[in-house]
């Protein structure tokens, strides 16, 4: 019984972090998307990585600013100096162009470990 309660508690913590990550991504999209009709259609699991170095982060940030989906003045958070680890979540977005045609995007959002900012975005 205690074991089941422990698993339930761990699952709720994980779901809470995933929900916080999703909300952070939604807020980022709302603030920085150039198109007025961008919606999230699917959200993957929250995971972590230590394989994204600072030069990759800089390149991903530049790609986003020049890619057309987000505003050129998009602001990103910074990776904390005391860790190489970032959280990551894969998201499927849907946009509509001026003709009303839907276009899907699959993106990976890299987040700081405290879930306070988006550090980089990669279009898959």
Please provide the spans of the model-predicted regions.
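Cystatin/cathelin-like cysteine-protease inhibitor module
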Residues: 15-124
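Sec-dependent bacterial lipoprotein signal peptides
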Residues: 1-15
